Design a protein with these regions (language model features):
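Short, ordered coil/turn segments that flank beta-strands lining enzyme active or ligand-binding pockets
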Residues: 22, 26, 121-122
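A conserved, well-ordered hydrophobic junction motif at loop->secondary-structure transitions
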Residues: 24-38
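Hydrophobic beta-strand-centered segment that forms part of the acyl-chain substrate-binding groove
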Residues: 8-10, 30, 44-79, 83-85, ...
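Short, residue-level hotspots on alpha-helical faces of the histone-fold
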Residues: 37-41, 45
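Active-site-flanking beta-strand signature of metal-NTP-handling nucleotidyl enzymes
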Residues: 14-18
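HotDog/MaoC-like acyl-thioester-processing domains
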Residues: 2-4, 9-13, 71-72, 83-161
Length: 161
């Protein structure tokens, strides 16, 4: 099991969101349910990319502690990394940061872990292939991240014998 600092080194930007008036709760901060929705949808997309399948469902979200408020006009960035693979599941470490466009500094707003399970057409859990797990780990080892840009994918493909 990796430490939080080791996980942070492998974080990949998944999405950016600007907080609008429709995201705000009654006390002037981003509504917690909106943040949870952003986390669930974005990490589901990340899990699907990592596992090469759109058929990933959320089965567990660990504790979420909201550390800093998000106001209208704030930009938040969601980062993710694979914490571990199971037979049919992938657990992600998620960190959402508020980004200051003037200074470039970021502060953590919330972090959590979220688990997704791969399912078949009937909704039954099915294994995540060993190839997917191995490829992800090789990419992290080589590139420091598991998902690659289009250019990196072409380079990776061309470098194979």
């Amino acid at each position: 099991m990796e430490t939080k600092k080791e996980e942070e080194k492998k974080l990949e930007l998944v999405t950016t969101h600007i907080c609008t008036a429709t995201d705000i709760g009654v006390f002037g901060n981003m509504f917690g349910g909106k943040m949870m929705s952003i986390i669930d949808l974005s990490s589901g997309a990340y899990a699907s990319q990592v596992c090469d399948t759109p058929r990933m469902v959320t089965v567990k979200i660990d504790e979420m502690v909201f550390k800093n408020p998000v106001k209208v006009g704030n930009i938040i960035k969601l980062y993710a990394t694979v914490k571990e693979f199971g037979n049919t599941s992938v657990t992600l470490y998620i960190e959402v940061r508020k980004h200051n466009v003037y200074t470039g500094k970021q502060e953590v707003v919330v972090h959590t872990t979220i688990k997704f399970v791969r399912i078949d057409d009937e909704g039954n859990p099915i294994p995540i292939s060993t190839r997917v797990k191995k490829r992800y780990e090789e990419r992290v080892s080589k590139h420091g991240k598991g998902l690659l840009s289009s250019e990196e994918l072409v380079e990776e493909k061309n470098s194979k014998p």
